[in-house]
Amino acid sequence: MPETRTIASSLGGYLRTRRALVSPADVGLPPTGRRRVPGLRREEVAELVGLSTDYYVRLEQGRADRPSAEVLDALARALQLSAAERAHLYDLARPRRGAASRTEAAVRPALRQVVQAIPSTPALIMNDRNDVLAWNPLAAALIADFPQLRPHERNMARRIFLDPDARQVHPDWDEAARSTVGMLRMAAGRRPNDPALVRLIGELSLGSPAFRTLWATHYVHEKTHGPKRFRHPVVGEVALRYETFQAPGTAHQLLVVYTAAPGSPAEEALTFLGMLTRA
């Protein structure tokens, strides 16, 4: 299994990956002919940020201690980072002292009741390790038979990368895989010493070449909202949208609710599945 600090993306690795994605033209620099590597050179990033090249090199080599907020904000602008990518940069560069090393594994009974009380659309609670902690009957009917799975198997990253039927269940597998890796990257930045996260990423790295390839991109993703498709053996493909809500008073527990457009085939499919779950 990889070492913890290898699994949690280092600041240097993240900076190198991100500057390779930004062309000189993207930041208004003149072309300089053929380049050996894609993206910006170290000295170009340093110039954009207002740093010496030596200091920026020390940042990429992990030899600069806790860069200031001003430096990190300037790096985020120069590398054109999104809000999630900027947050990840801060996590890597300025780890919070005393931060919890693991994610809560239990759901408050009242939160579990909230999920169960959602009658007509799939809903679940997951953490940023992708552990599914609570679900309603429609989520179990559509996504996976969570009650029949062992606790460690109730993890969407394992379902995506290690389940041989994953591409059948998830018609949008490529996007689902990329966003799942992005969530794990953000979690690793927040909690590089979380033992369960270390074990999970090690297991996925050993078991899935696709995961290893995506992990090497340093892509980060914060689950918020968007389209999601599932394929069910009885009702076929179901096109939904999801919205994500941070569960109050918990560490990185998310309520995810999937909804169908009114009058759509997906709504009819969910209605039929709901009838089956009550039969």
Please give the residue ranges for each predicted region.
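Recognition helix of helix-turn-helix/homeodomain-like DNA-binding domains
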Residues: 32-36, 42-43, 49-66, 74-76
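Amphipathic, well-packed alpha-helical segments that form the structural scaffold of globular domains
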Residues: 16-23, 90, 94, 116, ...
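Hydrophobic protein-protein interaction segments
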Residues: 109-127, 132-279
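An N-terminal domain-cap segment
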Residues: 26-39, 99-110, 116-117
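A short, Lys/Arg-rich alpha-helix, primarily the initiator
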Residues: 1-40
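Short amphipathic recognition helices of helix-turn-helix/homeodomain-type DNA-binding modules
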Residues: 1-16, 67-110, 128
